[in-house]
Regions:
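Structural signal for interior beta-strand "rungs" in well-ordered beta-sheet cores
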Residues: 88-197, 201-204
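Terminal amphipathic alpha-helical/low-complexity segments used for targeting or macromolecular assembly
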Residues: 1-92, 201, 209-219
Length: 219
């Protein structure tokens, strides 16, 4: 299996490289679509986005970015340039229930757990050691940070971001483009665009998504 890394401007690209290595996949190229040094530059040839050829465009690709809005924009950029095969990248140390469904472009990092009946939309990301409870529904481009835990039957909206070690009580809903801060404990529903922190989580402010960049409701 060969894989293209598209948008290699984030250190998180190194995580995708490690997962690919554990799977025995070859990194065919690292595509740089914005100015700046590619990270990591030593893994494969660095190709500028304006210099892609048909052979590369035929290879499955992944977008190794943690911010949902940036991942959405880079995925749209990749597809506009002719990539058509978003890879589902699952680390061999992760556990994904047979009854779970992962959308195109998903990345499940090392030792993450995706529970029974989970439904994840397009290009969702479960970072190291995250645990997504049974029958949880994730909208498109959701990011679940390292060590974050959701109880069963949670609903997480498009573009939402759960920070490192965040905890969601069972059946909690997190709105689209909301941000749950690192270590927050969420026991009540979180509105769209809200930034919540603390234990119990409280609204700090209204925002437009992690990093100030949201994901539109595309479907």
């Amino acid at each position: 299996m060969r894989l293209v890394l598209f948008a290699v401007s984030s250190p998180y690209a190194a995580e995708a490289v490690e997962t690919a290595a554990r799977l025995g996949w070859e990194i065919a190229a690292c595509v740089r679509n914005v100015d700046g040094p590619p990270i990591p530059p030593e893994v494969a040839d660095v190709v500028e986005a304006d210099e892609l050829d048909a052979k590369l465009l035929a290879i499955p690709f992944t977008v190794p970015l943690t911010t949902p809005g940036h991942r959405y924009a880079a995925t749209a950029d990749a597809q506009s340039r002719g990539f058509t095969r978003p890879a589902v990248l699952v680390d061999p140390t992760a556990v994904v229930a047979a009854s779970a469904t992962l959308g195109e472009g998903a990345y499940v990092n090392a030792r993450a757990i995706v529970g029974a009946g989970v439904r994840a939309g397009l290009s969702c990301s479960a970072n190291r050691g995250a645990s997504i409870g049974h029958h949880t529904m994730l909208g498109d481009y959701v990011s679940v940070g390292p060590g974050a835990v959701t109880g069963g039957s949670c609903r997480i909206g498009t573009g939402a971001f759960l920070g490192v070690g965040a905890v969601l009580a069972p059946e909690v809903a997190v709105g689209a483009n909301a941000v749950v801060g690192a270590g927050a404990v969420v026991v009540e529903d979180v509105p769209d665009g809200a930034v919540v922190v603390g234990n119990p989580a409280r609204t700090l402010r209204q925002g437009r998504g992690h990093g100030g960049v949201g994901v539109p409701a595309v479907r």
